Amino acid sequence: MTDGAESPVAARVRAESRAWIEANWDPDLSLVEWRIRLADSGWACPSWPSRWCGRGLPASAADVVAEELSRAGAVGVPDGVGMRLAAPTLLEHGSDDLHSRLLRPTVTGEITWCQLFSEPGAGSDLAGLTTRAVRDGGEWVVNGQKVWNTSATHADYGLLVARTDWEVPKHRGITYFVIPMDQPGVEVRPLRQMNGHASFNEVFFDDARIPEANRVGEVGQGWAVALATLAHERRYAGMGPAAPSGAAGRATREAGAERAVVYEPYQWYPQRAGRVDLVVERATATGANRDPVVRQEIAQLLALARSAGWTAQRARAARSLGRPPGPEGSLGKLAASQVARAASRVHTLIAGASGMLDGPESPEDGTIAEIFVSVPAVSIAGGTDEIQHNIVGERVLGLPREPDPSHQLPFRDVAKNPSAWRDRPSGDKG
């Protein structure tokens, strides 16, 4: 929230939500039981319509309730693809049927989601995707491959963009779907990363089926829906680490049963790496703070972190005012990438050669090495830094787009020989 006196509406929301949380929060409840109680109250998503776990309040109410949940040490709504991407996209573009079937169980955590956008040949140029969906009666049959998907191993549903028309330019032949993941035609394979983890997956579709009722938006108009999802993704990336209630709103497994247990926030390494207080603490403990080069790197990290913080505040303020995601999300994501890279530099500078070690005898139990190998992903995931620069240049600075006549050709012609268009000077195309 921004500085200044709290509005009467915010004060009322704070008082009412605090009273309800104090009367109802019980850490001995199972996670699902608590989230069902929260959803029934309307405090789960206070700015949503009352029929979908909300209270029809202004968008700013969500931040107030999140603060009150955090103050009480209570669990909030699930944090991840479901609430960050799927729910807002469905609210904006989904049918009433999708709302009634999917919104509430997303809020309670009874269903989970993954995002199925990128392909081996369509990452930054997402509109060049070739996964196809063909109508078959009341269903769509999907064949193709997606990659770099988180949560796909355990997701119930996926947000899928697929090509349904090859005879029109690439942006106009895409349709957006909600695909059930638990079916014979969907195969998920984890991808091993250089840090030893398998946080991402590749997903293969072999005659997978989607009910017509799971289409989001009109046939061939999926690019606009996909842009809405990507805008929400950039907004959250630009807002920085999750708010305390978001970090508190995750669960651990205790004695074999899900319990609403609050755990230490900032456990994702790149986010934790950017905490300047932790960097200063380690530099002081090792004596590296006496090195002027280290002090200069810490000062630069502090400046970048402060700048990123102000950008994140702009993104949060825009959301609280109910504004649609804008270019501040791209600016925030770029700022987060800069902070992560600067943090990686100073951490490895402080640790020296020992920072390359892994295991219990390495600095911070291998955290330094983990930061070093994980941070590059921050500049790629959710849209590369180059894509964010393009968005800022075109939508903030008003710079012209690079000419690309292939955008006017039927995608079938472009897909047959993409290098012929990619390698020729723009003046020779067409």
Regions found by a protein language model. Name each.
Residues 186-306, 378, 417-429:
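Glycine-rich beta->alpha junctions and the first turn(s) of the following alpha-helix
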Residues 40-109, 151-157, 305, 312, ...:
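Internal helix-loop-helix
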Residues 295-300, 327-334:
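Short, charged, amphipathic alpha-helical segments
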Residues 9, 26, 149, 330-430:
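Alpha-helix capping/hinge segments and adjacent helical runs
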Residues 143-191, 201:
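A short core secondary-structure module
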Residues 1-80, 85, 101-105, 112, ...:
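Amphipathic, small/basic residue-rich leader segments at the start of a protein or domain
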Residues 131-134:
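A structural signal for short hydrophobic beta-strand segments in well-ordered beta-sheet cores
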Residues 109-117, 161:
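A short, Trp-centered hydrophobic/proline-enriched beta-strand micro-motif
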